[in-house]
């Protein structure tokens, strides 16, 4: 059985739908065994290092989730597939869970333009990837 460590919050709809999709995929292609760590895992003693040691002890086959950019090199020690859901930067080393942010913006602009809105704007947070 494949062991997947999930480092995903479930505080918003995107995350809950992501978890539902992962479970649905596992039912069709599994069996997979999941372990989800809560969002406070980053604040425990030794932070990401503790998670890394836990993943090794549990013999995780893959990780899906959010990870601190500053600790990205730690994941290489595991030598397993990693899929990152990172809002600040896209990883050039690992697979990314991300969206077509430009396409979404274009879709929104067309929606408003078709309704004859001529002045509209986007407000985003500079530090997150979807704003770029």
PLM region spans:
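Bacterial carbohydrate/catabolite-sensing allosteric modules
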Residues: 1-62, 71-132
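Redox-cofactor binding/interface segments in oxidoreductases and associated redox assembly factors
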Residues: 65
